[in-house]
Every structure is written in structure tokens, then in C-alpha cells.
């Protein structure tokens, strides 16, 4: 059910009616297009395939098997019902001790056992969305700003800004060096903010990167840590994709750098955001973590955690699961293998029709380069192409402009939130759209021919303030149904 009218918006707060910081972006519009016409192999085979959802569904069978073997871990079983009354009562808002210990051990495991984490510094939140907002509330005041390398996760504009009132200042990264962040670019963004009298409180890094699927190397992390320390600003590292690395180089956590640089840096300025949504494929469990090396931040975040607690039943179940070292080791190994296999299958399918992706080693998505399909090298052309992909090809992929990418023609496409059959259907649709001429057993991509077809079309879009494309067949408002980004808030 959707709500079409907003007759009483004038009696609401500015926060409630501020569309600038909500979900008015092609990223969320793609979700709504999927909500209106979701693909189903039998019920709706011509519907929109959801490739805008960074969800890891490749290892559900492993978790299901563990639950079958450990029925006592859930109060929803005959064996576990005896724990119902104790779990149903109020618990310590700081979290069950066994849960925080299990989380700390799991964080160590996902970082190769190269660092240790203190359970007393583990603060719960309602998913990484809640964890990110919590850390911003702890570090900044309304009007303050954080630097963030672009392209970056689109919902940061909602999650980090909407209620906190902070600003995000993009640090432009481009394809000339495979979108790698440089200290020079960080310095320029910082100095420009200073000239504009904007108070910069910190730098936010997503490592591994969403949407690039790449990891930051040790030297880069050291340089960025040095920069933030020199300017006495915070370094917030969003590491929610830590265990999605499926190829070299390995993931390096900022915690490792701190161990190397203990005598040279101020740990009080460093904070980690983590969750189980990506690494375990459990976004519905809403487990987010703030881990700070600053005592005052830990204390403040704990007080704020009452606004977004993790249910005791969830803590109880996960404490048991994550304490099973044999299961965790097998899960992480198998997850990496399956992600590598799916990534290779998908990118090979794209390469067969001449579509390249940024070389990546982590994440649940690819950074797809569709620049050869643009009518012109403009963001208007990017949006026109996106509109056709949504409405005609029936794939929800996310345009680079929604990630604040500085170059038109890049798209994030997710590959781990569907079964093998759906992936192949998506690839078939892409193959049909791009067009392939077959000569014997060889396939010859004809991207340039498709580009010429685009030039014949008068498909242009002028950005509105909302970046909203009216030609996408959507209702003005969509209900927060289970597929909606209003529900799946951390993608």
C-alpha cells in the first residue's frame, strides 16, 4: 500500500519533510521500479531483476545446517523453549557479555587473526546504518563535515546526514588510477573546505569499498591515518565487507595499522563500523557494531545504543553460532570460494559481450563500465541509459551518479543476492541488449553499433533537484514493503 497524498506536510517538522536528505536518488528509484515489478521465474519471468541489492545469499545453506544441528540456540524450537522466559525479559543495554565476546572474536577471525578486539569496546546498533549514524552523532555537530572518497555508498547521504545535520564533502577519485584515493586528493578537499569555513571533523573510509569492490593497501591506510592525525580529525573506517574478500590482495584493517603505529598516532581519533549484514549475509538480523579506541566515544555510543538495540534472541543465537570456531572457519572459507566463483562467472559473462569492470577482489558487486554505450560523455546520457536498462532490459542496476562518481558511464551491479539461474537470465538480458554478432564459435561484441543506435534516439534527461527520472514508471511514494530500501536499509 502506498501513500499518495501529503496533505498535512505543513504541520510536520523540517526533518520529516526534508527531501534533500531522504531517498530521492536514482539509487532508490531503481529499488522502487523493482518493487513495482519484481522478477519471479514462474510468476513474473519478465519482471525487473534486483541487481541493486548488495546482499550475500550464497551461504544460507551453511547457516541453516548449523541451526538444525544446534536447536538449543533458538527459542523458536522445542529444544530451546526452556530459555524463552529469561530471554524475553529486559537485558543489559550494553549487550549480552557472551555476544560481545563472540563478536570481538569474529572480528578477529575476519581479519585473519592479525589483530585483537576488546569486547568491552563493542557497542551494538541497529545494523551498520544505525552504527554509522551513532558514530557521527558522537563526533560531530550540525554543520560540521566529513570527507569521503567518491564514488561512495548513496545512502550515506541519508544515513549520515539526515538526522545529524552534518555535511559530506566528496574526495574525487577517477578511472585514471582505478579510483584509488590519494593523499593529494584528500589534502585538496580538506583545504578547500577550510577556505569555505567548513569545519571538517573527520574522514570516512569504506574498506573494502562499496561500490568499487576494492581494498585499501597498507601504505595508503598509513598515509591517511597520518593525515588525519596531523590535522587532528577523526578517521572512521566502515569495514562491513571485511570477510567478502575473495582474491588477493588480502584485507587490511585499520586496527592492524594502529598496532604498527602505536607510538606515532592518536588512537582516540580512530573508529570502526562493522556489521554481520554482508560477511554473514544477515541484514535482517540488524546487527551493527561501533568499535572505538576512544573511551569517551564508547561511553557515549553505549548511551545512544538504547535507540537501536539488537534483540536478545538475536544476540543469544549469534553468540552460540559465532562461538563455534569450526563453523566460523568453514563458513568464511566457503563464502570466499563461492563469492570468487560467482564473481568470475558474472564478469566472464560481461566480458563475452565486451563489457569491462573495474578489477576487484572483494564485495558483492562489480563496478561496470558502460561508457561505450553512452550517447555522450555526460550524466544526462548516463541517466538515459539507466532508464532504458530499468524499463526495457528490466535490470535494477545503480548509476554511478548516485554514488557521486565524477565520471559518467559507470554502474554498480550486484551479483550475490540471487541464485545461479537468475544470474544467467540477467546475463542473457544484457547479452540481448548489447547485441552480439556470432561468427562460427566466436562472439564479437558490437558495443559501437549500439552506441550509434543511441545517437539516433532523443533520450535526454535534465536533472531535477531530486535527480528523479519521471519516465521510470513509479508511484510518487512507495510503501516500505519487504523489498524496499526503507526496510533493507543497508545495501
UniProtKB/Swiss-Prot annotation:
Record-level Gene Ontology MF annotations: 1-aminocyclopropane-1-carboxylate synthase activity; pyridoxal phosphate binding; transaminase activity
GO biological process, one term: ethylene biosynthetic process
Gene3D superfamilies xref list: Aspartate Aminotransferase, domain 1, Type I PLP-dependent aspartate aminotransferase-like (Major domain)
Cofactors named for this entry: pyridoxal 5'-phosphate
Alphabetical UniProt keywords: Ethylene biosynthesis, Fruit ripening, Lyase, Pyridoxal phosphate, S-adenosyl-L-methionine
Catalytic activity: S-adenosyl-L-methionine = 1-aminocyclopropane-1-carboxylate + S-methyl-5'-thioadenosine + H(+)
Keyword flag S-adenosyl-L-methionine: yes
Keyword Transcription carried by entry: no
Family of this protein: Belongs to the class-I pyridoxal-phosphate-dependent aminotransferase family.
Function: Catalyzes the formation of 1-aminocyclopropane-1-carboxylate, a direct precursor of ethylene in higher plants.
Subunit note: Homodimer.
Protein name, UniProt field: 1-aminocyclopropane-1-carboxylate synthase
Organism this protein belongs to: Nicotiana tabacum
Amino acid at each position: 500500500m502506498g501513500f499518495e497524498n501529503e496533505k498535512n506536510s505543513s504541520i510536520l517538522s523540517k526533518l520529516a519533510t526534508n527531501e534533500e536528505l531522504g531517498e530521492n536518488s536514482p539509487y532508490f528509484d531503481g529499488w522502487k521500479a523493482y518493487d513495482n515489478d519484481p522478477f519471479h521465474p514462474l510468476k513474473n519471468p519478465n519482471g525487473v531483476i534486483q541487481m541493486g541489492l548488495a546482499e550475500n545469499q550464497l551461504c544460507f545453506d551453511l547457516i541453516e545446517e548449523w541451526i538444525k544441528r544446534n536447536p538449543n540456540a533458538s527459542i523458536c524450537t522445542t529444544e530451546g523453549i526452556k530459555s524463552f522466559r529469561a530471554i524475553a525479559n529486559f537485558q543489559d543495554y550494553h549487550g549480552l557479555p557472551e555476544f560481545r565476546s563472540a563478536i570481538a572474536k569474529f572480528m578477529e577471525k575476519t581479519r585473519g587473526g592479525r589483530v585483537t578486539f576488546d569486547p568491552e569496546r563493542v557497542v551494538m546498533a541497529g545494523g551498520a546504518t544505525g552504527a554509522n549514524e551513532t558514530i557521527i552523532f558522537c563526533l560531530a555537530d550540525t554543520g560540521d563535515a566529513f570527507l569521503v572518497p567518491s564514488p561512495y555508498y548513496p545512502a550515506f547521504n541519508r544515513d549520515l546526514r539526515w538526522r545529524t545535520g552534518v555535511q559530506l564533502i566528496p574526495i574525487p577519485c577517477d578511472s585514471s588510477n582505478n579510483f584509488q584515493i590519494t593523499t593529494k586528493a584528500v589534502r585538496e578537499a580538506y583545504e578547500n573546505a577550510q577556505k569555505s569555513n567548513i569545519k571538517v571533523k573527520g574522514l570516512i573510509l569504506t574498506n573494502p569499498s562499496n561500490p568499487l569492490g576494492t581494498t585499501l593497501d597498507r601504505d595508503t591506510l598509513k598515509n591517511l591515518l597520518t593525515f588525519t592525525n596531523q590535522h587532528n580529525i577523526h578517521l572512521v573506517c566502515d569495514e562491513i565487507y571485511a570477510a567478502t574478500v575473495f582474491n588477493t590482495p588480502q584485507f587490511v584493517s585499520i586496527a592492524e595499522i594502529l598496532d604498527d603505529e602505536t607510538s606515532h598516532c592518536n588512537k582516540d581519533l580512530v573508529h570502526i563500523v562493522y556489521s554481520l549484514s554482508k560477511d554473514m549475509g544477515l541484514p535482517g538480523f540488524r546487527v551493527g557494531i561501533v568499535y572505538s579506541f576512544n573511551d569517551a566515544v564508547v561511553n557515549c555510543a553505549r548511551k545512544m545504543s538504547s535507540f537501536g538495540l539488537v534483540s536478545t534472541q538475536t544476540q543469544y543465537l549469534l553468540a552460540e553460532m559465532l562461538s563455534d570456531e569450526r563453523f566460523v572457519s568453514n563458513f568464511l572459507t566457503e563464502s570466499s570460494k563461492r563469492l570468487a566463483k560467482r564473481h568470475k562467472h558474472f564478469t566472464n559473462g560481461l566480458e563475452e559481450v565486451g563489457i569491462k569492470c573495474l578489477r576487484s577482489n572483494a564485495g558483492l558487486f562489480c563496478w561496470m563500465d558502460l561508457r561505450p554505450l553512452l550517447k555522450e560523455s555526460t550524466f544526462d546520457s548516463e541517466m538515459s541509459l539507466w532508464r532504458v536498462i530499468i524499463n526495457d532490459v528490466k535490470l535494477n542496476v545503480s548509476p554511478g551518479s548516485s554514488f557521486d562518481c565524477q565520471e559518467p558511464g559507470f554502474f554498480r551491479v550486484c551479483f550475490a543476492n540471487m541464485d545461479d539461474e537468475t544470474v544467467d537470465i540477467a546475463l542473457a538480458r544484457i547479452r540481448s541488449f548489447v547485441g552480439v554478432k556470432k561468427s562460427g564459435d566466436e562472439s564479437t561484441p558490437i558495443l559501437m553499433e549500439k552506441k550509434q543506435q543511441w545517437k539516433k534516439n532523443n533520450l535526454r534527461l535534465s536533472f531535477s533537484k531530486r535527480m528523479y527520472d519521471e519516465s521510470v514508471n513509479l508511484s510518487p511514494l512507495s510503501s516500505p514493503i519487504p523489498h524496499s530500501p526503507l526496510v533493507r536499509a543497508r545495501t
